[in-house]
């Protein structure tokens, strides 16, 4: 047994020495290649929007929309069961998005960072931090406040619902014409901007016209899987350069399966300071 351990230790030491020598030779004879590779690795980390959102923060703060189902009916019984206020049924796209955001923080930072989640209308002092607002203006008071005040120039959500951005209209599609007809595509929105309640911090708004679009927006923000790499890089460059920007995302839907999001449009906008009131 001792000889086996000695053999493994010897070969591990040899591998370490050889690796160090090869790395040194590569840097000596191919410095431009090494520097370029290191630069790309660092640049990929710096361009990660999540990293930019977490600057100066010990937690990722998430304000979720207040659309919940406070009760449900047990199978075989007509009596409703009331849910605790902190154990709601959430729209599945929002719930999946929250899980992905938490997972991304854990993957990136481990135990060095935490995730704090609360309802938007009970967010307390969370709005003083850089934070994520998860949900659209129909159900999320913070997002409604931002859009009602015209802080995102050229952008609006109209009845339908329809996203209107600089004259372009983006809408979901259905397999049918009735209100309950299933979705075949949905639109997600990413808004990256200065936090209007504390302009030294950032606000990231993620929502969809319907719940699948919310999940698609989170997916695109985290760059888990995006069909258009060129626009994804453009979005990341705008975030890295400190510019406020909007990204419009589209995804396909089959039953409850949400497809790979495609970024349809990315643009920057100029934030205009306006007198702020306490967060809603």
Regions from the language model: what does each represent?
Residues 1-38:
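Hydrophobic, helix-forming membrane-interacting segments
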